[in-house]
Amino acid sequence: FFSFSGLMLFFPLLLPVLVFDSIGSRTLLFKQERIGRNQKPFILIKFRTMLPGTPSIASHLSSASAVTSVGKILRRTKLDELPQLWNVLKGEMSLVGPRPCLTNQNELIQERETLGVYDIRPGITGLAQIQGIDMSNPQLLAEVDARMLTTLNLKNYFRYIFLTLMGKGLGDKINLN
């Protein structure tokens, strides 16, 4: 219900983003295999923020020059995440949970497996995101994800959503080299 409502609520934002995003990269949506609940892979959907052909690596390892001008705005405002509401509708993700990692982030996958993080669906936002922790420190990220799982209740669920909407957190870092 929340993801459908979110799609309807943010539809007026989605249309201009689709238009401007297509100008910057010619491809509107970005699809990538990620690790979901119980380590089951799924296809995550986002607005494209990087140039087509950019290697499929974690954002903190990507070059800043690979991010389109529109992509910088989408990342800063977190609007690039809106298409993931479709993943939520399909039951592959939740609004709140650990961010789904790439299939090649072996260290993070192992850390999360050890701490039981894969027991729940990944989310669009979570504790690590509002604290500004990205995937560049797999052990810290997995520990914060595990802590979120032990403290996740209805109040915190909506608190994380609210803080994300208010711009808390830095989003994924990119390599400035």
Enumerate the predicted regions with their spans.
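Short acidic-aromatic low-complexity motifs
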Residues: 75-85
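Hydrophobic structural segments characteristic of membrane proteins
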Residues: 83-177
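Alpha-helical membrane and juxtamembrane elements of multi-pass inner-membrane transport
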Residues: 64-71, 152, 156
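Short, well-ordered beta-strand elements within core beta-sheets of diverse protein domains
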Residues: 70-77, 146-150
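Conserved catalytic core of Hanks-type protein kinase domains
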Residues: 22-23, 76, 88, 133
